[in-house]
């Protein structure tokens, strides 16, 4: 049993270490050019439509959450009267 387990471990180790790596294109230089460009756009919106949507969703959730928290604090500060 132990011999089979050790053999399986060696096979798995060999498979992982000898598998070919995927080659990805290095996009860092082009992203650096995009984000360092002086075009008047805020850096948090330079990524395109996805960044703009993420920014707006974050803004809406933050404002909505703050308003809801203030509402709940106001409700909690004026308890219902008991008859």
Swiss-Prot record:
**Primary localization:** mitochondrion
Q: Which domain of life is it from?
A: Eukaryota
Q: Where is the protein localized? A: Mitochondrion inner membrane
What is its pathway? Energy metabolism; oxidative phosphorylation
- Its topology with respect to the membrane? Single-pass membrane protein
The job of this chain, per UniProt, is described as: Component of the cytochrome c oxidase, the last enzyme in the mitochondrial electron transport chain which drives oxidative phosphorylation. The respiratory chain contains 3 multisubunit complexes succinate dehydrogenase (complex II, CII), ubiquinol-cytochrome c oxidoreductase (cytochrome b-c1 complex, complex III, CIII) and cytochrome c oxidase (complex IV, CIV), that cooperate to transfer electrons derived from NADH and succinate to molecular oxygen, creating an electrochemical gradient over the inner membrane that drives transmembrane transport and the ATP synthase.
Q: Which family does it belong to?
A: Belongs to the cytochrome c oxidase VIIa family.
Indicate what this protein is called per its UniProt record.
Answer: Cytochrome c oxidase subunit 7A2, mitochondrial
**Provenance organism:** Bos taurus (Bovine)
Gene encoding this polypeptide? COX7A2
């Amino acid at each position: 049993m132990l011999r089979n387990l050790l053999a399986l471990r060696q096979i798995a180790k060999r498979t992982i270490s000898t598998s070919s790596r995927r080659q990805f294109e290095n996009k860092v230089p082009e992203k650096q050019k995009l984000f360092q460009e002086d075009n008047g756009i805020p850096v948090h919106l330079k990524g395109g439509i996805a960044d703009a949507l993420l920014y707006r969703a974050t803004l809406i959730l933050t404002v909505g959450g703050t308003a809801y928290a203030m509402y709940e604090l106001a409700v909690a500060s004026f308890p219902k009267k008991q008859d």
